[in-house]
């Protein structure tokens, strides 16, 4: 399923972005759900405006569901909708340095 189109980009060493083209959608038309390590972006479609009389209708407002599997060390930083583009910024949490522990040997 290729609708809606999306990109995944690397912003820097610890930040990634999923960008989804959602022209005409508003924030209340979109659900973003994180359950365990599965990120789901979905919509039941935009409410139809009966008063509009299209001569040509090329912008789709249909229902969709996109799922992305995230690694354990990926957290969602924020989601923004601007100019028809939904951006979900992901933050890669780097594991803390493992402390070196010296074990003393006891002579018996």
Language-model segments: which ranges?
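Alpha-crystallin/small heat shock protein
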Residues: 1-108
């Amino acid at each position: 399923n290729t609708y809606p189109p999306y990109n995944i980009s690397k912003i820097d060493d610890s930040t990634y972005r999923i960008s989804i083209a959602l022209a005409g959608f508003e924030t209340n038309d979109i659900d973003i759900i994180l359950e365990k390590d599965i990120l789901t972006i979905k919509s039941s479609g935009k409410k139809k405006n009966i008063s509009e009389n299209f001569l040509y209708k090329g912008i789709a407002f249909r229902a969709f569901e996109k799922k992305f599997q995230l690694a354990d060390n990926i957290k969602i930083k924020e989601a923004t909708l601007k100019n028809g583009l939904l951006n979900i910024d992901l933050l890669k949490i780097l594991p803390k340095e493992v402390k070196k522990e010296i074990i003393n040997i006891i002579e018996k």
